[in-house]
Amino acid sequence: MEFAAENEGKSGGGLHSVAEGVRLSPEPGREGVRDLAGAEEFGGGEEGKGLTGVKEIGDGEEGSRQRPEEIPMDLTVVKQEIIDWPGTEGRLAGQWVEQEVEDRPEVKDENAGVLEVKQETDSSLVVKEAKVGDLEVKEEVMDSSEVKEEKDNLEIKQEEKFVGQCIKEELMHGECVKEEKDFLKKEIVDDTKVKEEPPINHPVGCKRKLAMSRCETCGTEEAKYRCPRCMRYSCSLPCVKKHKAELTCNGVRDKTAYISIQQFTEMNLLSDYRFLEDVARTADHISRDAFLKRPISNKHMYFMKNRARRQGINLKLLPNGFTKRKENSTFFDKKKQQFCWHVKLQFPQSQAEYIEKRVPDDKTINEILKPYIDPEKSDPVIRQRLKAYIRSQTGVQILMKIEYMQQNLVRYYELDPYKSLLDNLRNKVIIEYPTLHVVLKGSNNDMKVLRQVKSESTKNLGNEN
């Protein structure tokens, strides 16, 4: 208080002018007090140049327009209280200023645009004056002898200012980043709205098409089905039926098909395991079925064998379950007292095979072959397939395999086409039904006829003698 009164008495209106010229800097990061109007000097200083002992900035500093360095006080307590000037009670431009600094200046930002600086001074007073346009800074010091410049404290303060500015810049960048994130979120939401299109409702019963596959039967449409047995692609039911007819495929997956060890996977192992379980389940079911345990009557088999033996034919029948046994449709007609045979015809030169059922034993071989190789009476479709036999001028030869021969020894009987089937089957062994091989005469084949073998053996004996 006394210090303020003495200053008021010495300076007169100068102190009032200083108070009016002092205002807070509105720029963030600048904590100094600016003096826009020059203050009268204390102790002989000129008006407008500030107090005595003030350092003026040279021309080089003004030209470079660098920010003036602030000189902190080392462990000084500065107090400044301005009281009892006319019309004002510590109020400067509508703002309260109470400056208190202990140990080092502290700056507190309470509101944006409002800065309260508290400084308490006991022996010396430092006032920093700066102009925005001219960058002029004036320092007023009561006792310049007590002011010491310490580089360490100055560097610390500069670092604190730099850190504070960095923090503010980071906050500003943080707000920008948040705004960018919000903008990106909005864009993502818009994209999701665009992507959320109504699902396509496929018609009922529409199956997924096999990618990049064509029907292997017609070759025009895209494949929709794949046969589990032969893995052939098909597009429709007619193509499925056609491929089954052409390849004699039943469409059922072959559980016992061969798979190499390189292609064997866990799915194949699981399939084999389930197959064995099915076999065990079927065997257990059969063992528990009382009806299946009954012995099958063999009266019909014995009757067929006895009738064939009476006619001089050695007929052999296979047990139930064999394929040839299932295919056999031979029966004995009691009214006519003759056999109606199941006959298989094979044409090796055309790779064709046909079956004749209910063939009476009094029918000749030529009559049996007439619907196949006769140029006039044969079926047109069969004639087209057996055109090699129809166009042949050498004629055909009818052979039948000899049963119960030694291993890897295959021989054939040559049948007489002008004799009946019964005459050709006498004194021969027949397993289930006769199979006739129709070959072209003079064709090079590995079929050796029994008559040729006998003639060759007799020739060899004559040459030795």
Swiss-Prot record:
Keywords: Isopeptide bond, Metal-binding, Phosphoprotein, Ribosome biogenesis, Ubl conjugation, Zinc, Zinc-finger. Residues 56-70 have a biased composition (Basic and acidic residues). There is a cross-link at residues 79, 108, 118, 138, 148, 157, 168, 178, 195, 454 (Glycyl lysine isopeptide (Lys-Gly) (interchain with G-Cter in SUMO2)). A zinc finger (HIT-type) spans 215-249. It comes from Pongo abelii. GO terms for cellular component: nucleus; pre-snoRNP complex. This is Box C/D snoRNA protein 1. CDD domains: zf-HIT_BCD1. Gene3D superfamilies: 3.30.60.190. Required for box C/D snoRNAs accumulation involved in snoRNA processing, snoRNA transport to the nucleolus and ribosome biogenesis. The keyword Metal-binding applies. The gene is ZNHIT6. The lineage of its organism: Eukaryota, Metazoa, Chordata, Craniata, Vertebrata. Coiled coil: none annotated. Interacts with FBL, SNU13, NOP58, NUFIP1, RUVBL1, RUVBL2 and TAF9. Interacts (via HIT-type zinc finger) with the RUVBL1/RUVBL2 complex in the presence of ADP.
